[in-house]
């Protein structure tokens, strides 16, 4: 159907969750990068959202700091338990951010990509569109201070311009070995894009 819709309902929340980084040691490097960057984009979208609040902004920035400091380590050395633990913690914070606020349209756009191409990993799809997506906001002069905040959280303590966020994102992608992904390697064709854009507007934007 070329649709990939998100759902949310109170009954989907577990009574108890056990997040055990020991179980994550064997996750392959590429999948670790994809899933860790999905976490990062949950945190970033939640931080930029109009629904952000003091409560989940705290979770967002803390989670982004953890991703900036530990994700590449977890990708490079899967048995680095300290790195696994901190990435898992960031992922948990991302869940708190989503459940107390709202994400932006980056996820909606990616859902269409992977609806058309089910073999496209969700995290990879987010990576493919991330620079253009956040660059659009920066070019429009939106959320200037928040982009600077996120650049600093990623490790650039001297960040002073929103563009520094894109540089920090580029470094994170490079450090995780996923900076050179292309749409064509996942079978995405330019002629599909108009239909995908229409699908986003019709099936996802109203939600």
Could you tell me what each predicted segment is?
Residues 33-36, 84, 126, 193:
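Short runs of predominantly hydrophobic/aromatic residues within well-ordered alpha helices
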Residues 1-52, 145:
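A glycine/threonine-rich phosphate-anchoring loop and its flanking beta-alpha core
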Residues 46-163, 167-168:
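Active-site segments that bind and position negatively charged phosphate/pyrophosphate groups
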Residues 42, 69, 73, 171-174, ...:
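A generic structural signal for well-ordered alpha-helical segments enriched in polar/charged residues
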Residues 151-207:
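C-terminal charged capping/lid subdomain of soluble metabolic enzymes
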């Amino acid at each position: 159907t070329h649709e990939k819709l998100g759902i949310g309902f109170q009954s989907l929340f577990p009574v108890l969750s056990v997040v055990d980084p020991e179980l994550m040691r064997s996750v392959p490097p590429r999948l670790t990068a994809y899933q860790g960057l999905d976490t990062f984009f949950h945190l970033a979208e939640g931080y930029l959202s109009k629904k952000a609040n003091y409560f989940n902004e705290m979770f967002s920035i803390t989670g982004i700091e953890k991703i900036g400091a530990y994700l590449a380590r977890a990708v490079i050395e899967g048995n680095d338990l300290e790195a696994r633990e901190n990435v898992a913690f960031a992922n948990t914070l991302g869940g708190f951010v989503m459940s107390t606020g709202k994400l932006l349209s980056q996820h909606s756009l990616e859902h269409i990509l992977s609806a058309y191409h089910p073999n496209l990993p969700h995290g990879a799809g987010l990576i493919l569109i991330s620079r253009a997506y956040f660059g659009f906001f920066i070019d429009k002069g939106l959320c200037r201070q928040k982009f600077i905040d996120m650049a600093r959280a990623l490790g650039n303590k001297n960040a002073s311009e929103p563009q520094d966020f894109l540089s920090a994102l580029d470094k994170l992608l490079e450090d995780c070995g996923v900076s050179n992904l292309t749409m064509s390697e996942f079978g995405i064709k330019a002629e599909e894009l108009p239909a995908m854009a229409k699908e986003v507007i019709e099936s996802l934007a109203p939600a």
